[in-house]
Regions:
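Short, well-structured N-terminal submotif of metal-dependent ribonuclease cores
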Residues: 1-40, 54-61, 134-141
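Acidic, PIN/NYN-like endoribonuclease modules and their adjacent C-terminal/linker elements
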Residues: 3, 104-141
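A conserved hydrophobic position in a structured secondary element of the catalytic/binding core
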Residues: 6-7, 41, 78, 115
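A generic structural signal for short hydrophobic patches within well-formed alpha-helices
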Residues: 11-12, 46, 83, 120, ...
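Short, flexible helix/strand-to-coil boundary loops that buttress conserved ligand/catalytic motifs
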Residues: 15, 87-90, 124
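Active-site-proximal, substrate-binding regions of enzyme catalytic domains
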Residues: 19, 26, 44-82
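Active-site neighborhoods of divalent-metal-dependent phosphate/nucleic-acid chemistry enzymes
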Residues: 71-117
Length: 141
């Protein structure tokens, strides 16, 4: 079973029904819910989601969405090593560097799902959009 870090843009696509991306993003969350894949988020992703969703919804509603999300995903830890690796990386976006090294620090993460492929070009992990990941799973069957 694949262990996948899901970037915040993918989660937002699903939660905000951002077409056309929401189709595949919703499939990814469904796969997490059914146990087909293990989806992981970081505390930074939860913080970003709260901040962005709070702009359009009340605190209680946002917290409820995040509670639903945490039921179907797991949280990667971030520690000093993750921050130091991110600080010394070649990533131009520090937040993406944090996500990347949180996934690498947890050695069994297989890949990162994001729509911002260019932001992760320096990653050692496989980087996929939700669409290409779903297509690659279908071709393996």
């Amino acid at each position: 079973m694949d262990k996948i870090l899901i970037d915040s843009d993918v989660i937002l696509d699903a939660l905000l029904d951002r077409k056309p991306f929401s189709v595949h993003a919703t499939q990814i969350l469904s796969m997490c819910e059914t146990g087909e894949i293990n989806g992981y988020l970081t505390p930074v992703i939860y913080s970003n989601l709260y901040y962005l969703l709070r702009r359009i919804a009340k605190h209680e509603k946002v917290i409820e969405k995040l509670k639903q999300l945490i039921k179907i995903t797991k949280v990667l830890t971030m520690d000093q090593q993750v921050v130091e690796n991110a600080l010394h990386s070649g990533f131009l976006d520090f937040e993406d560097a944090l996500q990347n090294y949180a996934a690498i620090n947890r050695s069994n993460i297989d890949l990162i799902l994001t729509r911002n492929l260019k932001d992760y070009k320096n990653s050692e992990l496989g980087i996929f959009t939700p669409e290409t990941y779903i297509k690659s799973r279908k071709s393996k069957r």
